[in-house]
Regions:
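A short, amphipathic beta-strand motif
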Residues: 270-278, 595-605, 799
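Short, acidic Ser/Thr/Gly-rich low-complexity loop/linker segments typical of extracellular
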Residues: 295-316, 620-637
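Short, internal strand/loop/helix patches
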Residues: 766-796
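Hydrophobic/aromatic-rich core segments of domains that either
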Residues: 116, 120-136, 145-156, 160-253, ...
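Short active-site neighborhood of thiol/selenol oxidoreductases, capturing the structured segment around
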Residues: 713-731
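Conserved small/polar residues in nucleotide/adenosyl-binding loops
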Residues: 798-805
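Short, ordered, surface-exposed loop/turn motifs in non-cytosolic proteins
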Residues: 279-298, 320, 511, 603-627, ...
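Secondary-structure boundary elements
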Residues: 3-160, 390, 395-544, 554
Length: 806
């Protein structure tokens, strides 16, 4: 008789050990957690301990035990009731089924709810089948919508019915994990062929990882709109929060999080070697090497390594250009080196470190061209659904869209209505009521979809006493407003107020800079126990006495506002400020901007920051881009006050094939100096702009509905296919121009194919007139539901799409 399975038998010891270490470091927080664990079953308690053992300190401070209990109970239930889940390797189960965090999202209870919603739809399915079905459910509930940088919880994406790709994938991963399908989010941190990034989902089955587009269901795995785009990536990564790292190439860490290289599943790759030497030509062991791609006109890191005893670092990457920089600190002095490497043609590169203080001299202050090559797309993931599968998928997707549109048509967050209607005590009722709409109005659109009435109520109640002490706009934006940065919106004012006596509160109001001194003494930063992009809330900082530098800055603003002091983080550089004598003053003395850079734009280029130019300062062996705010060129001149030091200006011209013509200008500026530089954008020749793009097969219809392959229509030579939206631009404009050049187009009419939705389109004035003038043009039909997107995305591999998203 087989022995009964033991839950997490292989990892039990290390889970207990790591949990005890966390509890030892945060005893005040873990005392009530331990009490609650004693009331759980042995399996649920162990699952909870795993979550607590490997979660960031921010999660420990931000969320109550009951949130994590939902994840633990659901995971244990799956393990007990689903043989497929019980058969998973423990590391796969722990990291990709049980674990609560996907990326940097808000954490909220969702797993049990999702399982009850989805469970009946996947009865009897294997992981592959279940993953496809779950993704249809996700498409029924949410779709893409461009939003701000704060990442919603999975349940909030479900409720509001949309999110950006990073939020769609957080939602889909949680849905998959809720029913036992191992899943994770993967990222192209920056594309090489266009200014953007993207996130999607991988699922584990049959011992391998497969991918799918979040909320973008297909009838097969390893298929998504981004399939070709991913074959042009220089890096695709996943992340793991556990300290026991799965097999794979580690490409960097973010505090407690380890990043893994997943590119081989998507693109043609090779291993490159970087050798770093010091000024004497000796190997530099322990140098930090950053591998970067040019994106949004700045060099953005996609992987980081440290050199070994031979001064070498190796990376598996795609076949394109990388900007590679290295830095090292010796006796308090930083050394730096950089180069551009085309990995398609080169296997190795060598960097020689020089003191960053000697990085620039007068002779080097000139524009230097750099050609940046994007990888070619390659047929790596070529599986395609059959015609029957596509037809089935289209039908299901249409139904999913209809369901979702009905769900979100008139949806609004009921918590907002509850907050607006709530009455406060009799004395303050009239005053508070007048500020309820103001409080909601000062929140972001995203905040209004997931805020909680009780949270807003505390902020209103404890801020109202200060409303008459300043201008209304100042009070609403910088005292009443619960939002400081991208932190989770929670209560904190009552928690803060009880920490100070009446005398202490008045002293802090009189000199708000003292708030920061108190924070520095009371709150410690443990970056090795955090993820930099996950913020500890003000109340969480107080509970755990820990927080990142950003979390502590947010805490400063929260304390100041709680005490009635108008405060904010500066929108340009996130520096702490409070209002004094009607203007914001910095809490920490800023480095003096003691010199001036005058940039000349010229007359032919429209310069847009982080689109075709940027400027970065060299500090601690690393260039950091300046976050310019509302600065604009006036009469082709931009005056930038700067701190003295070494800088690099980048300009970039993205070509249709994804390559870039870059220009770099390195310079040093001294205290008191005024320096003039004219921005230069490299121009492209016509031959640089042209590109042959291989298009996927697609079907069109004749007038009688017969389907015809596009390849058959173009078998006898080159053709122009024009998908026309009658009586809309740019169709109308193009048709009129064709008629103006009737003679030039007449000789090519037989090679021109107009694609329209219906016969009625042919009767519209401009189109019917064009057909009368340009005889022999062929007419075919399509409903524009799929082909347009497919072809458009294929072409977008070679152009810059819409604003950044993640």
């Amino acid at each position: 008789m087989a022995e009964p399975r033991v839950f997490l038998k292989e990892n039990r010891g290390r889970i207990e050990e790591n949990y005890l270490e966390q509890a030892k470091n945060l005893p005040r927080v873990f005392a009530p957690v331990d009490e609650k664990l004693q009331k759980c079953t042995e399996e649920v308690a162990l699952a909870c301990k795993y979550l607590y053992a490997f979660m960031p300190y921010s999660d420990i401070g931000n969320y109550p035990f009951e949130v994590f209990l939902d994840y633990a109970e659901n995971g244990v239930k799956l393990w007990k009731e689903n043989p497929q889940v019980a058969d998973l390797p423990e590391e796969i189960f722990l990291n990709y089924v049980l674990f609560h965090r996907v990326n940097e999202e808000e954490i909220a209870q969702c797993r049990t709810y999702f399982r009850t919603e989805i469970g009946s739809r996947i009865q009897g399915m294997n992981f592959r089948e279940a993953a496809l079905e779950v993704n249809y459910w996700c498409a029924e509930e949410a779709t893409y919508h461009c939003t701000d940088d704060r990442t919603l919880s999975a349940i909030s994406v479900y409720r509001r019915g949309n999110g950006r790709c990073g939020e769609e994938s957080v939602f889909t991963v949680n849905a998959l994990r809720s029913v036992g399908v191992p899943a994770r989010q993967v990222y192209a941190p920056k594309w090489s062929h266009c200014d953007d990034n993207h996130a999607w989902v991988e699922i584990w089955c049959d011992g391998k990882w497969y991918f799918l587009g979040a909320c973008e269901p297909e009838e097969i795995l390893n298929k998504g709109w981004f399939t070709n785009a991913s074959s042009r990536a220089m890096m695709i990564h996943s992340r793991v929060f556990d300290t026991k790292i799965p097999e794979g190439e580690v490409i960097g860490t973010d505090g407690m999080v380890t990043m893994l290289n997943e590119l081989k599943r998507y693109a043609v790759t090779k291993e490159i070697t970087v050798t770093v030497k010091d000024a004497q030509g000796l190997p530099s062991e322990g140098a930090e090497v950053s591998f970067e791609v040019l994106n949004y006109s700045e060099y953005a890191p996609i992987a980081e390594k440290k050199t070994d005893s031979k001064g070498t670092a190796r990376l598996t990457t795609g076949l394109g250009s990388l900007h590679i920089s290295a830095r090292m600190c010796s006796d308090g002095e930083w050394f730096y080196a950089e180069t551009v490497m085309n990995t398609e043609k080169e296997d190795n590169c060598e960097l020689c470190l020089v003191s960053q203080d000697k990085r620039n001299d007068g002779e080097s202050e000139k524009w230097t061209a750099a050609d940046i090559f994007a990888p070619h797309d390659a047929p790596v993931n070529t599986d395609m659904p059959t015609l029957e599968q596509k037809a089935k998928g289209n039908k299901r997707l249409t139904a999913a869209n209809a369901h979702r549109e009905q769900k979100v048509r008139n949806w609004s967050n009921p918590e907002c209505e509850r907050f607006l209607e709530k009455k406060v005590n009799r004395i303050e009722e009239a005053i508070a009521a007048s500020y309820r709409e103001d409080l909601l109005r000062v929140l972001t659109e995203k905040d209004r979809t997931d805020c909680i009435s009780d949270v807003l109520e505390e902020h209103l109640e404890l801020a109202i006493p200060y409303h008459s002490m300043m201008k209304k706009d100042t009070f609403v934006s910088y005292v009443l407003n619960p939002r400081v940065d991208d932190e989770v919106l929670q209560k904190y004012r009552r928690e803060i107020k009880k920490h100070f006596s009446r005398t202490e509160k008045q002293e802090l109001r009189d000199d708000p800079s003292r708030i920061w001194n108190l924070i520095e003494k009371a709150i410690v930063s443990r970056p090795e126990k955090e993820r930099s992009s996950v913020i500890t809330t003000p109340a969480g900082c107080i509970r755990t006495c820990t927080g990142s530098f950003l979390s502590k800055k947010i805490l400063f603003v929260a304390i100041a506002r709680t005490l009635g002091v108008a405060a904010r983080l500066n929108p340009h550089d996130r520096s702490m400020e409070y209002m004094k004598n009607g203007r914001f003053v910095p809490v920490l003395a800023r480095t003096e901007k003691n010199c001036t850079l005058i940039l000349k734009a010229g007359e032919t280029v429209q310069w847009k920051y982080f689109q075709n130019w940027s400027i970065a300062k060299l500090e601690n062996g690393r260039y950091t881009s300046l976050k310019l705010g509302a600065e604009n060129f006036e009469d082709q001149i931009l005056n930038l006050p700067l701190e003295s030091g070494n800088y690099r200006i980048l300009t970039s011209n993205r070509l249709p094939n994804g390559n870039m013509f870059a220009n770099e200008y390195h310079f040093e500026i001294q205290p008191g100096e005024t320096k003039e530089i004219e921005l230069v954008l490299r121009e492209a020749d016509l031959e640089d702009m042209l590109e042959n793009i291989s298009m996927p097969e697609f079907m069109l219809k004749t007038e009688d509905g017969t389907e015809v392959k596009a390849s058959d229509l173009t078998a006898d030579g080159k053709h122009i296919l024009m998908f026309l939206e009658e009586e809309k631009e740019p169709t109308e404009h193009i048709l009129n121009e064709m008629m103006e050049q009737e003679e030039a187009f007449a000789g090519y009419a037989e090679q021109i194919i107009f694609v329209v939705r219906s016969k009625e389109a042919l009767e519209t004035p401009t189109l019917s007139k064009a057909l009368a003038k340009l005889k022999n043009i062929q007419i075919y039909y399509d409903d524009f539901s799929e082909i347009i997107n497919t072809l458009g995305r294929r072409c977008l591999l070679y152009t810059s799409p819409s604003p950044r998203d993640s």
